[in-house]
Amino acid sequence: MSSGMDWLQVESLDLEAQGVAHRADGKVVFIEGALPGETVQVQVSRRKNQWEQGVLSALARESSQRVRPGCPHFGLHAGACGGCKMQHLHPAAQVAVKQRVLEDNLWHLGKVKPERLLRPIHGPAWGYRWRARLSVRYVPKKGVVLVGFHERKSRYVADMLECPVLPAKVSAMLPALRELIGAMEQRDRLPQIELAAGDEVIALVLRHLEPLSAGDAARLRAFGAEHGVQWWLQPKGPETVHRLDEGGPQLAYSLPEYGVTMPFKPTDFTQVNPQINRVLVDRAVRLLAPQPHERIVDWFCGLGNFTLPLARRAAAVHGIEGSETLVQRARENAAANGLAANTSFAARNLFEMSADELMTSGAADAWLVDPPREGAFALAKSLAELRGREGWTPPRRIVYVSCNPATLARDAGLIVHLAGFRCVAAGVVNMFPHTAHVESIAVFERSEAALSPRPVGEAAPELAAEPAPDAVA
């Protein structure tokens, strides 16, 4: 039996940014804090027949990619924040790891190999997170209020005085937020503050379990005036979110290259990283290459993040989204940006899309697909079922933006092997630096095979089935 104090050679990182090594007997060891190429010892916390898990305890050979973390709350120490997992790895190396995760998932789960790799999309590693959900905890025994992310592998809130992945103004505001909550009458009934920042406005959504007193409302107003933030309140579910006081500037972000401004509410889905979102939108539009005479369908369109820029280039864009509320907001955004004439929107459950429904709603020259983590299985499956059907012409190109490499790989397998498309390109988007989250973009082009039925008896590779498994490390 191997000793927990054996020196191990770290081979790779898994999806949780843990180092992966093997003992002499072949057992896999997952090591938090270790990097590929390092020789380490591990303090084992869990043991199973085939694997072990633990924390880096000693380091004999250090990776050249190891860097000093940029936040004092990051690390393996007790009480460390669990919001980031990769601050000890050079940002360029983080991108390389995510690219490998994408390629491995496409191949192992979808049996798909892109014809070329896209240049990774990346940007500033700090101050990028314009959306965040911060937990709040009043600790009576210590007489303090904690505001921040949870501790690593814990339900407790980390004792944070700064957070460099948040906008600098918000990071610097954390101590003042703690003081504010500590002074409020309802301090033990305020579990969460959600950040939603736009180009000009920083909105904070306060979740409160009891009605706020007049005194507490006055404290919020004074804080907002001093720190330049807009308060929203959430007494119950997301549908109850409302402004503390009406008036003032509107929460919005812009896509300057396309002359688009997108008003939104704090509860609406918007990308965490606005700088990367601008680059991503431009990359997606250029890859889709809509022509002035073409019709585009934007699946999972949300507020119109891709719909409206595409409408600047194409004859018509039809956005489809599961939420009627978001569809209405997308219509309003299209009208506000002068794009109502060549955009249309519809609410539809895209997780139950049948081939017949796709036949009537999916006819277009090109598709933009931007699903949530669950992916677009029903859409990809129906596309495959329509292959060769009389009266159906599949889109010439599909650009698929993904926030889960496992479901992208599953759907890519259907699109390539059963629907008859080629995966001509794929690449990563580092939307969340210092985390293990992998965002990506893939491009599929219609081949001649997509226009004819799949040959009877043609063998298909064994593909990942619905629901998708966890991503491959």
Curated annotation (Swiss-Prot):
Summarize the protein's role: Catalyzes the formation of 5-methyl-uridine at position 1939 (m5U1939) in 23S rRNA.
Q: Show the active-site residues.
A: 403
Question: Which gene name does the record give?
Answer: rlmD
Q: Which residues form a coiled coil?
A: none
Q: What is its EC number?
A: 2.1.1.190
Instruction: Please write the reaction equations for the catalytic activity of this protein.
Output: uridine(1939) in 23S rRNA + S-adenosyl-L-methionine = 5-methyluridine(1939) in 23S rRNA + S-adenosyl-L-homocysteine + H(+)
GO molecular function annotation: 4 iron, 4 sulfur cluster binding; iron ion binding; RNA binding; rRNA (uridine-C5-)-methyltransferase activity
Which Pfam families does its entry note? TRAM, tRNA_U5-meth_tr
* UniProt keyword Hydrolase, yes or no: no
Task: Decide whether keyword Secreted is in the record.
Answer: no
The biological process GO terms on file are: rRNA base methylation
TRAM domain segment(s): 1-58
By sequence similarity, the record places it as follows:
Belongs to the class I-like SAM-binding methyltransferase superfamily. RNA M5U methyltransferase family. RlmD subfamily.
User: Which residues are noted in the entry as [4Fe-4S] cluster-binding?
Assistant: 71, 81, 84, 163
Q: Matching InterPro entries, A to Z?
A: 23S_rRNA_MeTrfase_RlmD, MeTrfase_TrmA_CS, NA-bd_OB-fold, SAM-dependent_MTases_sf, TRAM_dom, U5_MeTrfase_fam
Q: What residues does S-adenosyl-L-methionine bind to?
A: 271, 300, 305, 321, 349, 370
Taxonomy of the source species:
Bacteria, Pseudomonadati, Pseudomonadota, Betaproteobacteria, Burkholderiales
Q: Which PANTHER family match?
A: 23S RRNA (URACIL(1939)-C(5))-METHYLTRANSFERASE RLMD, RNA M5U METHYLTRANSFERASE
- What keywords does the record list, in alphabetical order? 4Fe-4S, Iron, Iron-sulfur, Metal-binding, Methyltransferase, rRNA processing, S-adenosyl-L-methionine, Transferase
Designated name of the protein: 23S rRNA (uracil(1939)-C(5))-methyltransferase RlmD
Q: What class of enzyme is it?
A: transferase
